[in-house]
């Protein structure tokens, strides 16, 4: 039996089968030819171009960024108020005894002698120009006149007292300084007619002028030395020469 008559028949069967598959694909897809639609997926193409920017969105809530670096130190502020005092510290230990001042005293003696010599020289100069020295008293005047209370205050300022003669020699020394009436440290302010010195002691020496004291107008409670050397009672509010008495 020959094979060639069967070949056309075989080809016809294959075409019929192929056609049958094509019709079935159209019924399922109903689009492009069955050969393209029913073939295997192709290879992916190149990416397309970027699309246009969309519309601008609404502003978002503020966010918190990363913590920055520490900044430089600021300027110094004003000083604060002083704080309260602290508690007292513990008592320290007793210190060692100090060095003996023997050497210092030996050096001070010559200096002390020099100073005393200078003081004596000044005393002599002052006595010669403005005062008189009698025994252990030095009488000095500044040549001013003032009331009795001011005379007392001025003499006290120099650790002295108002001149008070206790004997004839002292009275003569004061008389040599007087070119006008000078206050003496004698009053009867406490008891009228009873004259005492400024310490309250009764007088053991007096040299009243004739007819004195007379307490004229009942207000003469102080005493002045006249140029003649005699004494006279006067009002304490009157102004007379200042003479102070210094111990020597």
UniProtKB/Swiss-Prot annotation:
Domain Collagen-like: 42-99
Gene responsible for this protein: MBL2
One BP annotation, GO: complement activation, classical pathway
Post-translational modification comment from the UniProt entry: Hydroxylation on proline residues within the sequence motif, GXPG, is most likely to be 4-hydroxy as this fits the requirement for 4-hydroxylation in vertebrates.
GO MF, one example: D-mannose binding
Cysteine-cysteine disulfides: 155-244, 222-236
Subcellular location: Secreted
Domain C-type lectin: 134-245
Record has Hydrolase as a keyword: no
Chain segments annotated as coiled-coil in the UniProt record: 112-130
Region feature Disordered, mapped onto this chain: 43-112
Principal cellular location given in the protein's record: secreted
Signal peptide: 1-20
Source organism of this protein record: Callithrix jacchus
InterPro entries in the record: C-type_lectin-like (IPR001304), C-type_lectin-like/link_sf (IPR016186), C-type_lectin_CS (IPR018378), Ca-dependent_lectin (IPR051077), Collagen (IPR008160), Collectin_CTLD (IPR033990), CTDL_fold (IPR016187)
Protein name: Mannose-binding protein C
Any Pfam family: Lectin_C
Keyword terms of this UniProt record: Calcium, Coiled coil, Collagen, Complement activation lectin pathway, Complement pathway, Disulfide bond, Hydroxylation, Immunity, Innate immunity, Lectin, Mannose-binding, Repeat, Secreted, Signal
Subunit structure: Oligomeric complex of 3 or more homotrimers. Interacts with MASP1 and MASP2. Interacts with MEP1A and MEP1B and may inhibit their catalytic activity.
Chain positions with 4-hydroxyproline modification: 47, 73, 79, 82, 88
Free-text comment about domains: The coiled-coil domain mediates trimerization.
Transmembrane spans: none
């Amino acid at each position: 039996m020959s094979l060639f008559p069967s070949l056309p028949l075989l080809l016809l069967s294959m075409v019929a089968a192929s056609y049958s598959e094509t019709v079935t694909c159209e019924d399922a897809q109903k689009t492009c030819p069955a050969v393209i639609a029913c073939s295997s997926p192709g290879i992916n193409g190149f990416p397309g171009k970027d699309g246009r920017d969309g519309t601008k969105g609404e502003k978002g809530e503020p966010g918190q960024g990363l913590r920055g670096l520490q900044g430089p130190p600021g300027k110094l502020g004003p000083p604060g108020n002083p704080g309260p005092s602290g508690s007292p510290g513990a008592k320290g230990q007793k210190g060692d005894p100090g060095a003996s001042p023997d050497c210092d005293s030996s050096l001070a003696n010559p200096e002390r002698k020099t100073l005393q010599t200078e003081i004596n020289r000044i005393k002599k100069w002052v006595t010669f120009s403005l005062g008189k020295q009698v025994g252990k008293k030095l009488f000095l005047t500044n040549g001013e006149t003032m009331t009795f209370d001011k005379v007392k205050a001025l003499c006290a300022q120099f650790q002295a007292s108002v001149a008070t003669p206790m004997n004839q020699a002292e009275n003569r020394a004061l008389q040599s300084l007087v070119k006008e009436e000078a206050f003496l440290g004698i009053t009867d302010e406490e008891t009228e007619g009873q004259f005492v010195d400024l310490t309250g002691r009764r007088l053991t020496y007096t040299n009243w002028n004739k007819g004195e004291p007379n307490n004229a107008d009942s207000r003469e409670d102080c005493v002045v030395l006249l140029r003649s050397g005699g004494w006279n009672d006067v009002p304490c509010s009157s102004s007379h020469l200042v003479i102070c008495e210094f111990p020597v």
